[in-house]
Amino acid sequence: MTVYERLDRLFEQNNGILKTAQVLENGIAKSTFYAYVRLRGAEQAAHGVYVSPDAWTDAMYLLHLRCAQAVFSHESALFFHDLTDREPSPYSITVRTGYNPAALQADGVKVYTIKKELHGVGIVTLNTPFGNPVPVYDMERTVCDLIRSRSGIETQTFQNALKQYAKRKDKDLRKRMRLHIQHRYCY
């Protein structure tokens, strides 16, 4: 199998999205990869992230690859948990305090920051509509985030999300209370 065939297979295995780090892990030189990118017409979607010309672009997954510490939250998490019928625009993510979100904000991403101790609380991995895994805050954490940030959320989105959450059979009120008691997270 030639190097280009191996790269074709890597793109195929990764739904048309490939990171330079993945190429290097497979023992392929950067110069060979860049020549392949030019020849095949792949596009650079972000630093070190390339998309095949025949692949559907999964913007949520690309955002995750671009900023590994980003966790989908607020309106974006509502979408993942079926607590809203609207696709999020712009995407909402949460990063640790100290991360410089200027480049993400310039690209239209709504960025929230939170202290390091709370950043990892309630993270689950869910699939985007394209089937790619991304980190998302769980339903209880998402409701707490909405309550904390309610002044920056559309009133209709906020009310509908709380109504949908209240109707859910799989909600975990004890978990929400633990978030409140242990971390003083929900008001």
Question: Whereabouts are the PLM-identified features?
Answer:
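Nucleic-acid-binding surface
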Residues: 6, 15-26, 37, 45, ...
